[in-house]
From Swiss-Prot:
Keywords: Cell outer membrane, Membrane. It is found in: Cell outer membrane. This is 29 kDa outer membrane protein. May be involved in transporting molecules across the outer membrane. The keyword Membrane applies. The keyword Membrane applies. Its main location: membrane. One of its GO terms (cellular component) is cell outer membrane. It comes from the Bacteria. Its absence leads to imipenem resistance.
Length: 24
């Protein structure tokens, strides 16, 4: 996935969500 991991968080769809709890 083209998500930028930052501080154990992933930027996806302009939202900050914990890595591992990302919804597809």
């Amino acid at each position: 996935d083209e998500a930028v991991v930052h501080d154990s968080y992933a930027f996806d769809k302009n939202q900050l969500i914990p890595v591992g709890a990302r919804a597809e």
